[in-house]
From Swiss-Prot:
It is an enzyme of class 3 (hydrolase). One of its GO terms (cellular component) is nucleus. The active site is at 135. It comes from Rattus norvegicus. Its EC number is 3.5.1.48, 3.5.1.62. Interacts with HDAC3. Interacts with HDAC2 and NCOR2/SMRT. Interacts with HSPA8/HSC70. Interacts with MSH2. This is Polyamine deacetylase HDAC10.
Length: 588
């Protein structure tokens, strides 16, 4: 399975036929620019391109009224003056003789993508469509939107495939009030939207775009609005919104499908949005969503934005503005779906595993390399002496293989790796690997988090420990509320993940931790696993490090008071240094 790309050139046919400053930005070039960018970067050829058919009137009727569908169909025969008159009946809308055809293709593209993902033909995908859809309502066009593509796709997934939980993430800079209205009383759809709001003074100027609108009836609590009351929101704001608001809700909701209303006017450079998030940020957001719903993500284009340029450097940073190049935010969002985090060159070896004892049988996924290489014996012994630890012969053999894997990651030859060590040598091996990293990079910036003991403790802003949460809610709060904010704030070159004797993590917990740490470091993770655990952990870790979705943590259970207390203690101590932990508004 791969990534689908859904597009049809006929969707460029509709265009504005009269002067209208408000509507002139909705032009064919908004769509062709996105496709051209994908082609220039070589992403189109890595996707499975799917054909598109028009959505049927029955499929449109999953969301829209028969009268409204008939009205849009009638525009095929109207002249310019009649089209102009009809358009003025709606807010920020224009009609064209090809509007009905284009809008049916746009809805059909979303349906085609959902079918491909839910039948297993592809793992995820992107539909480049026009006109957009998230503002359109049951019987009204609105904000350039004619048919609500994402809402139709969600209803289709429920009706045809029997899905009971669908997450819709709307990161367009405008509130997708059309989607909200359609699902506001439906508990099977969790709708999340961030949008420029400015206390109701930004389009669409609706009080129901505010945070206190949470759905109604049985759907109360399933609408989540995050209104931006100022412009200039950047990468840290978007990441904080995902880590502290969206993802905790999404994990508890446990969706079977994720639909993204992918509007990119929320990126830097768009004059309408006036936000500061770089294109790379959307790649990270997409990768964070991939741990949900078995990785079944369907992104459907809304407002493409102005396609700001971004860095083509091999190591893009989330805290720097984009520089001159030909990359678009749409391309950055697609890259992680193709298992290419951000813009880092793909190493020759994706995943490597080194065993303490050669020839041990492991059931590993295809494409995972059994690494037999080792650092030279003299070099290994020198590192062991430097650490002043007693290594037995078996320990030295395992250390040599671990050093070889580490050098491969640091030199860009290996993306991720799993190494085994003996129980007694785990701590010493980790110490040697840390020293090797410091020697290679010439820096001593180390963030050390220990999961052990019965109480949270802190020795410095870079060294602390926490007890292992025993509930799913506590473990998720630990990852989303502490580990990932620290990882994104620290921006490490790589992650060393040591799973020593009695580490206490269940396989699913270790897999989720590894999967979610891939994004901040571009996949550069070395997992050090105690040899008695390797048979159970190796395949699971290899799968998630390769980009597969981690296994479920099981039924959701609320965090205990003790787990909440430990987390709050650490956050209170660390907040002054780590900005992504600073999510509470200052007192007035």
């Amino acid at each position: 399975m791969g990534t689908a790309l859904v597009y049809h050139e006929d969707m460029t046919a509709t265009r504005l036929l009269w002067d209208d400053p408000e509507c002139e930005i909705e032009c064919p070039e908004r769509l062709t620019a996105a496709l051209d960018g994908l082609r220039q970067r070589g992403l189109e050829e890595r996707c499975q391109c799917l054909s598109v058919c028009e959505a049927s009137e029955e499929e449109l009727g999953l969301v829209h009224s028969p009268e409204y569908i008939a009205l849009v169909q009638k525009t095929q025969t109207l002249d310019k003056e009649e089209l102009h008159t009809l358009s003025k009946q709606y807010d920020a809308v224009y009609f064209h003789p090809d509007t009905f055809h284009c809008a049916r293709l746009a809805a059909g593209a979303a349906l085609r993508l959902v079918d491909a993902v839910l039948t297993g033909a592809v793992h995820n995908g992107v539909a480049l469509v026009r006109p957009p859809g998230h503002h359109s309502q049951r019987a009204a066009a609105n904000g350039f939107c004619v048919f609500n593509n994402v809402a139709i796709a969600a209803r289709h997934a429920k009706q045809k495939y029997g899905l009971q939980r669908i997450l819709i993430v709307d990161w367009d800079v405008h509130h997708g009030q059309g989607i909200q209205y359609i699902f506001e009383d439906d508990p099977s759809v969790l709708y999340f939207s961030w949008h420029r709001y400015e206390h109701g003074n930004f389009w669409p100027f609706l009080p129901e775009s505010d945070a206190d609108t949470v759905g109604r009836g049985r759907g109360q609590g399933f609408t989540v609005n995050l209104p931006w009351n100022q412009v200039g929101m950047g990468n840290a704001d978007y990441l904080a919104a995902f880590l502290h608001v969206l993802l905790p809700l999404a994990f508890e909701f446990d969706p079977e499908l994720v639909l993204v209303s992918a509007g990119f006017d929320s990126a830097i450079g768009d004059p309408e949005g006036q936000m500061q998030a770089t294109p790379e940020c959307f790649a990270h957001l997409t990768q964070l969503l991939q741990v949900l719903a078995g990785g079944r993500i369907c992104a459907v284009l809304e407002c493409p934005g102005v396609y700001p340029e971004c860095s083509d450097s091999p190591d893009p940073s989330l805290d720097k503005p984009p520089t001159n190049s030909t990359c678009t935010v749409a391309e950055d969002s697609l890259s992680p779906c193709l298992d290419r985090p951000c813009h880092r060159p793909t190493p020759p070896i994706c995943i490597a595993v080194a065993l303490a004892v050669s020839g041990a049988a492991l059931d590993l996924p295809p494409g995972v390399l059994h690494q037999e290489g080792s650092a030279l014996r003299e070099e290994t012994e020198a590192w062991a002496r430097l650490h002043k630890s007693q290594f037995q012969d078996d320990d030295l053999a395992a250390l040599g293989k671990s050093l070889c894997l580490l050098d491969g990651i640091l030199d860009g030859q290996i993306r991720s790796a799993i190494a085994t060590t003996t129980a007694l040598a785990t701590a010493a091996t980790l110490g040697v690997l840390i020293q090797r990293c410091v020697a290679h990079r010439g820096q001593r910036r180390i963030l050390w988090l220990s999961i052990r003991g019965k109480e949270a403790d802190i020795w410095s802003m870079f060294h602390f420990s926490t007890p292992l949460p025993q509930t799913t809610g506590g473990f998720l709060s630990f990852i989303l509320g502490l580990v990932l904010p620290l990882a994104y704030g620290f921006q490490p070159d790589m992650v060393l993940m040591a799973l020593g004797p009695a580490h206490g993590l269940q396989n699913a917990q270790a897999a989720l931790l590894a999967a979610m740490l891939r994004s901040p470091v571009g996949g550069r993770i070395l997992a050090l696993v105690e040899e008695e655990s390797i048979l159970q952990l190796a395949r699971t870790l290899a799968q998630v490090l390769h980009g597969e979705t981690p296994p479920s943590l099981g039924p959701f259970s609320m965090a205990s008071p003790e787990e909440i207390q430990a987390l709050m203690f650490l956050k209170a101590q660390l907040e002054p240094r780590w900005k992504l932990l600073q999510v509470a508004a200052p007192p007035p």
